[in-house]
Amino acid sequence: YDPYKEQILITYYTRDDKNIESIRIDNEVIYADYEKIVKYDFLDRVFCYQKRLWVHVSKDAKDKLEVFINNKQIMIGKYGEYFLDIKNIRKEFQKRLPKSNIWLLMDRDYEADDNAEHLYRYIMQNHPEQEIVFALRKESSDWERLEKEGFNLIEFGSFEFERIIKKASKVISSHSDEYLMRYITPRQQFIFLQHGVTQNDVSKWLNSKKINLFFVATQMEFDSIIKNYTRYKFGQKEVILTGFARHDALLRNKQSDIKQIIIMPTWRASAINNVFNSNERNMKEKFKRSEYFQKWNSLLNNNNLKKLCEQYSYTVVFKPHPNIMPYLKDFNLPFYTKIANQDESLQMLFCNSSLMITDYSSVAFEMAYLKKPVIYYQFDKDVFFISHTLQKGYFDYQKDGFGPVVQDEDSLLIKLESLFRNNCKVFNNYKSNMESTFAFKDGKCCQRIYATLIQLNIKYLM
């Protein structure tokens, strides 16, 4: 139930996606404001659909809500009633309205520098009338920086944090991990800013979250989530195409004359999960035997990579995924490779790099936003989407990507030299992908996000 828009969500499961619903309030037929059909499949076969209908309950409605499917009245509610009392619905959900209009924003508990930080800064500078706080652990390297800037900081997990999050009207975060979600109750609206562009199918993970609204950056991403017959439960009521808050800063800080390449692969569940519950020595040995470690360690120590970078005067920066940081000492990093400073802004790292080497990570979209080339090193593409924590989505790296896809070191170095010779300028076929991918590149993403958040609590206007 959305008490602000006075809309109620009606859901049911069916094997027939062509059902005709008739929803009646006080014996009058009303029509859904939003509809979504979610498919559930098993072994490549659809076994049922979920229909999700958001229906407006007008202020004049006083009696009962009934639902008919194919002209047959169905039971609704927890106890199998054939109708629900409108007054009771309103009464129950009015109790859940928040106690204040304070907004709590955060990125990770131990790290800022993501969409929530950038949105907070925009609100602080442009809408001081809105009461906001930013949650972070005090030991975070970002705490002092944000404190000096004037952020109203509260320590994540503290008594003050728990007091404020209970009364907050909105919790706004770039992450939706359990350490934060366990604090979310029906009283708050949880706003998901996302950490990166959703390019793969993470519906199983996202569908388990209580998300009132989330923001996306590309049209393909938007369509892959809201369209009927996807695995996502979210539709046009919950998903808004605005661009990411941090992208405004990317545009402002773009550098193009720094000869630096960044190597930034994602992690592998197969290299990490299989070492849980092991002692530290066994854990390290198993990681070092993984294909993931051997391939990336080999590339970092490749003598031809060293020669190319010396010949064309490029520096190399290695930025491991946070899940790989415990194993960083296992990499035999040569003297010419720098480890990215963990205290340095990730946004500035993108801005100060000319080229990225990654595998499947959505960080490639950040470079694409800056119109900088990417090389995808996918030595395990035949098994990655089977053994990792997600399913392949709409994004085709060969067709939709922002640079060449390679499967071995030699091919990677050939593509790298080609880009070095071209002064790291993007080749035309990838340039068109970069130009067509993002819905907005106007520096107004924060403005659109804030306007959407304000609209959330405005009374029904449809």
Give residue spans per PLM region.
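A nucleotide-sugar donor-handling region in carbohydrate enzymes
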Residues: 82-89, 187, 203, 207-289, ...
